[in-house]
Amino acid sequence: MENPHSILKKVFGYDSFRPGQEDIVSRLLAGQDVLAVMPTGAGKSICYQVPALLLPGITIVVSPLVSLMKDQVGALVQAGVAAAFLNNSLTDNQKALMLHRAREGWYKIIYVAPERLEMPGFQRFAQERQISMVTVDEAHCISQWGQDFRPSYLRIKEFVDSLPSRPVMGAFTATATAHVRADIRTHLALQAPYEVTTSFDRPNLYFETRRALPSQKPKELLELVLKEGNHAGIVYCSTTRQVDETVQLLQSRSIRAAAYHAKLDADTRRQNQDDFLYDRVQVMVATNAFGMGIDKPNVRFVIHYNMPKDLESYYQEAGRAGRDGQPARCTLLYSGTDVRTIRFFIDKEREADNGLPADVKAEAARKAEERLKYMTFYSTTQHCLRGFLLQYFGEAAPKKCGNCSCCLAAEQEAQLQVEYARRRAAQSADRLEKPRRAKPAAGSLSEADEKLLNALYAVRKRLAGKQNLPAFMVFNDATLREMAEKKPMSIDELLNISGVGEKKAARYGNAFLRVIEDAVGSRE
């Protein structure tokens, strides 16, 4: 009989749940509503995908991000899950076919935009089939106090109330204040929900802040991107003009870059995002205000060219890096001009004729100013950046994490003082020690294993190209790295690699095993 652990291993290829995931899965399977606040990259999707495969009926996932739906459904289909999405990126014929198949029971998981819940055709389908669970992703969009309020989210409750029997509900978000969480509970009418906030700590992310005058930022940006080699990254800018100028700057240095912002037409945005997902573009440059919903696990760096409006936005955007658990760098370039730009937008929002009462707009502006204050503190602090972020989100924080620019600057200063004293002592004794050779980084591969890893990348690229898939949907970088380290020689051994489920092992396993066998054989 299937259970959460067997589904996790068989379908997704993981031996164990991440912190917080198993409790959420158990509660949903027991019929208890859930409100989960989990940072970007913490594995929210597993929390509802696993129970969706164990519940008797269909799970509907409400998401505001069209591109994310496509990516998540694509990944599920690759893992052998019957999943589909329904949004305006489909033609009318495709929508009709998808709904027809949904009525016939083809799918276990269906992703929809919130507006789709109001469509008569979708409502008829939901009346005819058993809906076991409704999951609301990016649930903070339901709150006027959240940074991404969407009025269509307010009608989710009406849809749920219209169903023949009430499904269990899960609400997930990366960041939510107490006020926003209260709005989520109220507007979704969650019944005695299990509420959980998992750790916001992402140990694999290196945080860095750099003060730079506007005239210095292009040089700083180029230095950062060129240092990353061919690794994929995202650069966030505060205006569409800066996005376009930054793309031109990067392209002038032969860096494959593309833009993503609201002023581009939908086809261009979709093409640019696909180019990034399929590794035809190395760097995506996007506006802070325009959420990409990118689900690319091997993003190795995120650079904020401008300071975002608040730490909630910053952490969510920075969290796009390193979703595969491998080391990644998050750099913030800031200047006093950034603060003035954000204040301009706050004032503009306060004066906007949007139908809200003056006192409500004034309170919203006050809260925005408060959030900006903490964003500014983060940008200028001399103390541990990780500690500052964790403390802001209400979590116990270390005084020093050892993996941010402030901690390393303090350590390097101390090391320089020690080195200076040592050299002075050595000089007085008329001797100088030879510098020690640096030890290889923990977890680094041998030269032979690096060669094998590159061969595995090549196989993945070929297999993905044949199916017109992003490479990470075959296997992510962390999975290939573990293959290069452990060198499985059979399908059974391959199934012990994290991220290898049964369907993927059957579909792709032999191609990767042949490369590993050749590499091992050539060394003997």
Report the location of each language-model feature.
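Short alpha-helical segment immediately N-terminal to, or the first helix within
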Residues: 27, 304, 378, 482-483
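Short alpha-helical "packing" element that flanks the helix-turn-helix/winged-helix DNA-binding module
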Residues: 21-24, 375, 480
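Generic structural hydrophobic/aromatic packing signal, biased to beta-strands
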Residues: 270, 334, 375, 404-407
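Accessory DNA-binding and partner-docking regions appended to nucleic-acid-acting proteins
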Residues: 1-4, 340-341, 346-361, 367-373, ...
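Helicase motor core with emphasis on the C-terminal RecA-like subdomain
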Residues: 2-11, 15-19, 23-45, 52-55, ...
